[in-house]
Amino acid sequence: MSAVLVTAREFVGDVIGQEAAQFLRFHASARRGVDPESVHQLRVSTRRLRTDLDFLRSLLDSSWYRDVREDLAWIGGRLGARRDFDVLIAFLEELASTDESLDRSVIFRAETMRDRGRDGVERALGRTRYHKLLVTLIDATLWPPLRDPDVIVRRIILDKLGSSWDKLRLASDTVTNEASDLHRLRIVVKRSRYAMEIASPFLDESRPIVQRLARVQDELGQLHDDVVTCDFVVAWYRSARAARGVDPFDASDAWLNAIHKRGEQRRDLWRAPLAEALVLIDDVSRNSSYLEWSEGEQSI
C-alpha cells in the first residue's frame, strides 16, 4: 500500500513495534547489570516511546495512552537513576585522567550511588509491572489501541510535524545561554527530531534534517551533563561525608574549573547544525506539495 494511504492501524502498530523490539533486545543484559550500554539503550527506548506516544496521542485510546505513559515514566526513572551515574563517572574519570591533582573521592561517591542504582534497575526489570508493560507493547504492535483504526494518517502526521517545527523555531529564536534555557531547547530539538523520524515515510527530505537535529541534541546534552556534574561535585564537597584531609573548597574549585574549561570548548557547537536544520525545514515548508491532500485523508 502507498505510504500516502496508510491507516492508523498500520502506522501506529509499526511505530510501537520498533520500540518494543528495542525493549526486548536490551532487556536481559540490562537486568543482569553487566552492560551499561544496554541500560542506556533501554532508557533511550523508554524516552523515545514516551515522546512518540505524545506525538500520536490524538490517534490513541486515551486511557491506554495514560496508563502506558505512566508505566514508561516509572521504568524510565529507575533506568535513569543508574544511567545518569554511568555518564557522570565516565566524565569525571575522563577529567581525572588528564589532571592527577583532582581529588578522586567524588568519583568513589558516584560509584557507590551507581551501585545502588544498579540494584534498583534489577528489581524494577524483574517486577510484574514491567513485564505487563512489555506484554502491553507487544499486543499494541498487532492491535494498536486506536480511536479510529482505519483513518488515513498522512495528513494528520504532517500537521503535527508542522506544529513541532513551529515550536522549534520559537525555541531557537528565544534561547539564551542560560543552562535552563539550553536544556529546554534540547527537549524541543529531541521532540522535533523524533517527529521527523515518525513522519519520514511521508517526507523524502527528512534524513538530512534528522542528522543535524541529532548533532544539536548531542551537543546540548554534553552541556547539560556539565551542569549536572557541577551540581554533584558541589553537593559532595559541601557534605559532611567528603574526604578527610582535603580542603573541600579547593577540591570543588579544581573540579569546577576543569569542567568549565571543557564546556567552553563546546559551548557553541550546537548553533551551526541547528541553523542548518532550520534552513532545510524552511525549504521543505515552502514546498507545498507535501501538504497536498489526498482522497480519503482527514484531520483529527
Predicted regions and their residues:
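Function-determining surface determinants
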Residues: 1-300
